[in-house]
From Swiss-Prot:
Residues forming coiled coils: none
Family statement: Belongs to the bacterial ribosomal protein bL21 family.
Biological source species: Deinococcus geothermalis (strain DSM 11300 / CIP 105573 / AG-3a)
Lineage: Bacteria, Thermotogati, Deinococcota, Deinococci, Deinococcales
Protein name, as recorded: Large ribosomal subunit protein bL21
MF (Gene Ontology): rRNA binding; structural constituent of ribosome
Amino acid sequence: MFAIIQSGGKQYRVQEGDVVRVETLKGEAGDKLELKPILVGGNDTLLGDEAARFTVNAEIVEHGLGKKIYIRKYKSGIQYRRRNGHRQPYTAIRITSIA
């Protein structure tokens, strides 16, 4: 059985035991979360009110920073060059059950 959950404006397809990196969530490592699925699939696909009967239980594994990306700006002819770096914070969660 799988479910599609929404977190931080993005949707993720998850199954039991998956570890997923989502946008930063409040809480410490080891805290439990309950997420509502948008869609639940398996032998039958359930949407809307039918999927709302289910809950996706998860546990926070860690907080961290993603891979560094570099942003470069350049304007020709005037020697304008800029380079900035960015590391997006994330929260890794482990899906414990879909019930």
